[in-house]
Amino acid sequence: MFMMNTDSHLFLDEPLADALPLYEAKMIHHFDHRWAEYDLEGSVNGLSDATKCDFSYEPRPRYWVERAEVDRRLAAQNWKHKWLIGWRDICRKTDYRTLIAGVIPISAVGDKFQLLLIGLKPSLAAALLGCIS
């Protein structure tokens, strides 16, 4: 959705009232949209199990994007759901998998998390996610 280099002028360092987090691929893992977060120094850290038990906890991204810009880009794709399915863009010899898929809430998304914006019913989209994971 957002190229991390050419769209960087849209990124906010602090959240505004109507801004959405910018999820990066490194923050997501299998069936876990709260795999990691940025600390205040800009380092990525995994979330503890205790933190993940707090269902209201939202991982801190490095950047935020105004909701209107995210809505505009999703509307251009005719996307009406409150969630996104995608996969991490990975290709390292240390990875056991060539695809790590996940579901995230509506948010801004960096270019290393490839989105799958298809017109399936949510139940079929969930089945597809299970198959590709």
Name the predicted role of every residue range.
Residues 1-133:
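Polybasic, glycine- and aromatic-enriched phosphate-binding surface used to engage nucleic acids
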